[in-house]
């Protein structure tokens, strides 16, 4: 149909406050267009899928500490920085199991130049084995 269009967006942010601000921005834009063109011209559906795991992981610094130890033991220099990606870890963190993101060997995610390095994937595997050992002690 020529007279219809749809758009889908994924809202992500490190900050829950900024995350909510972005949703309010979409609501305000919807209200503006509805006011200008009338009811039924635009429809906004918001569905929260997950939140950034930071607020669920930060209270448990030992989780990050062990991850860093496991990486170092695998010969990897840890780089601790926030990411906005949606992962199973975000969902698990909100279910009560704090799960920070770890590396997997992939680069340039979600684009035509995405790839995985076998060497880095092996380092990721060794990191997981090291985590099992560290948490098992």
Put a short name on every predicted segment:
Residues 1-137:
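Metal-dependent amide/peptide-bond hydrolase catalytic core
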